[in-house]
Amino acid sequence: MSIAIGTDIVEIARIAEVLERQGERFTDRILSPSEKLQYQNHSDGIAFVAKRFAAKEAIAKALGTGIGHGVSFQDMVIGNDEKGAPFAELSNGAAEVMQARGGKKMLISLADERHYAMAYAVLT
């Protein structure tokens, strides 16, 4: 049973501009240590960061909090299973909010095209 949904879309060029201006300050705020390692080794790092940013924003919307209201970017890790399907691991404030809302799992879908990255999150 679905409890809530969230979606987000981001212009990849906007993420590129932020990375140009802020560099590691931005990636340190958005990415977990494991995600940062993947980013550093990824062939398209800008799209990688854009998808993680969109995913975490979508998750925060599904939680009903947004970022900064007891939920931070660091409370969420986006990974891929052995077949490449994305998954989300929630901890700290994000996990607490999920449990308080009666959720057991956060399902996500990610997509990117030349100019945009988008994410869809479903709290179940």
Where are these regions (language model features)?
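Core catalytic alpha/beta fold that binds nucleotide/phospho-ligands
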Residues: 1-124
